[in-house]
Structure formats: structure tokens, C-alpha cells
Design a protein with these regions (language model features):
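Bateman (tandem CBS) regulatory domains
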Residues: 1-4, 57-67
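The conserved cystathionine-beta-synthase
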Residues: 5-24, 30, 49, 70-89, ...
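Short beta-to-alpha loop/turn elements within the nucleotide-binding domains of ABC transporters
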Residues: 10, 40, 57
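General secondary-structure edge motif
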Residues: 13, 25, 42, 63-64
Length: 102
């Protein structure tokens, strides 16, 4: 799971390295308490670079704070896959009741 997580103070270049290592084109952004506060994709990184945001900048201005997620307790795999396909989504994290990634 660690390869999918970055914190809000992570630099853009470090987040990009995680995206490259996990080979999934996204990361889940967590706060100091380990709760998910957003997601970030390789596309978000590209758009930041095109806006001349420095690679050393932290991701706080870049990641998506309004994100869709599945609740672990209510997860139905078929419905989840159908939702992703219907909404042309490549990814949505699964969070527990404390909003921690699982």
C-alpha cells in the first residue's frame, strides 16, 4: 500500500517518482494522521509542469481534494467496476470508516 501513498508535503518530483514506481498512474494523498485527503494522477503532474510549477514544489496546490472513493464496508466489486466504467474513471481509492486507505 505504501507505494500508493504520499503526504501533503511531498514534492512534485517525489510524487512523480511514486507514480512511476507503482505503475498505476496515481497516488493517494494522506494527511499526518494517515487519512486520505485527495488523489493525484500523472495528468495532474503534467498540468502542473505546463503551468510552470517547480518540481521542488509540494503537491498541496496540485492534488485533487474533491475526489470520489469507495467505502470499504459498502464495497460491491461489480458495482464498483460498473461505476468506474460508466464514469470513465481509471481509479478510486477504497477507504475505511476513518477515511484511511485500505
Amino acid at each position: 500500500m505504501e507505494k500508493y501513498l504520499v503526504n501533503t508535503n511531498t514534492s512534485l518530483v517525489e510524487a512523480l517518482k511514486k507514480i512511476e514506481v507503482n505503475n498505476e498512474k496515481h497516488v493517494i494523498v494522506i494527511n499526518k494522521k494517515g487519512k486520505a485527503v485527495g488523489v493525484m494522477s500523472d495528468g495532474d503532474v503534467r498540468r502542473a509542469i505546463l503551468k510552470n510549477i517547480q518540481l521542488s514544489s509540494n503537491i498541496s496546490r496540485i492534488y485533487n481534494k474533491k475526489f470520489f472513493y469507495f467505502k470499504e464496508k459498502e464495497l460491491d466489486k461489480k458495482k464498483a467496476i460498473d461505476h468506474l466504467i460508466k464514469n470513465k474513471m481509471m481509479f478510486a481509492p477504497i477507504l475505511n470508516s476513518k477515511k484511511e486507505p485500505v
